């Protein structure tokens, strides 16, 4: 069971308030997952967005609808990205440019994302192929690696050249409430979670 009694999940471009000032939105994804959960937190005269969805035409359109309708035409004040996966960071660059706001994320996630984007269009390195073969990958797995290598950046709008670094245990204000950063790894190298004790 979902812990919030919010009624039905939001449709594309819609939002559901799950806590005072915290809006739950869903952005479309292709494939089995179908959607990614993203968040908008009331922040003064605008919204702090947490995660953005992938860089696709459908996701961009869903955000345009959300900006106009669900978020009431208010500006985005900052974009917080929890980790480097394209379904979370894909439109961060687009959004920060559109609203002239800062990208906030952990250092390792930002730098690793930039590194992976730099490989876009390149062929799989022979060193990588040898490494994975020695690690026991079969020919199908190696071919999948070769075919998919260099595609990471295709789902990510160009990132800004600078960002505001998030650190584990750091606290800051969003919309008059104190939020704490809690980092972890496993799903990604330095994933950031946001925690607000008041909510």
Predicted feature locations:
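Conserved HGGG/HGGXW glycine-rich cap/lid loop of the alpha/beta-hydrolase fold
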Residues: 26-29, 88, 183
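Metallo-beta-lactamase
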Residues: 47-57, 149-157, 161-164, 171-173, ...
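Divalent metal-coordination and catalytic microenvironments
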Residues: 21, 41, 51, 83, ...
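Active-site HxH/HxHxD metal-binding segment of metal-dependent hydrolases
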Residues: 58, 65-173
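A short, surface-exposed loop/turn module that caps and links secondary-structure elements
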Residues: 10-12, 167
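Conserved beta-strand hairpin/beta-sheet module of binuclear metal-dependent hydrolase folds
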Residues: 12-74, 194-199
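N-terminal presequences and immediately downstream first alpha-helices
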Residues: 1-7
């Amino acid at each position: 069971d979902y812990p919030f009694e919010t009624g039905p999940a939001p449709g594309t471009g819609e939002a559901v308030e799950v806590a005072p000032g915290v809006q739950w939105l869903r952005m479309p994804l292709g494939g089995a997952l179908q959607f990614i959960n993203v968040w908008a937190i009331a922040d003064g005269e605008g919204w702090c967005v947490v995660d953005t969805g992938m860089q696709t035409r459908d996701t961009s359109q869903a955000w345009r609808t959300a900006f106009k309708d669900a978020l009431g035409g208010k500006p985005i004040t900052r974009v917080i990205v929890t980790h480097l996966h394209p379904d979370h960071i894909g439109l961060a660059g687009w959004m920060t440019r559109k609203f002239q706001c800062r990208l906030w994320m952990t250092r390792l996630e930002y730098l690793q994302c930039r590194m992976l984007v730099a490989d876009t269009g390149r062929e799989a390195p022979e060193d990588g192929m040898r490494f994975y073969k020695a690690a026991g990958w079969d020919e199908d797995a190696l071919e999948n690696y070769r075919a998919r290598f260099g595609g990471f950046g295709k789902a990510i709008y160009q990132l800004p050249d600078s960002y505001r670094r998030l650190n584990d245990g750091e606290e800051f204000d969003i919309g008059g409430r104190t939020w704490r950063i809690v980092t972890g790894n496993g799903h990604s190298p330095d994933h950031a979670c946001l925690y607000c004790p008041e909510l």
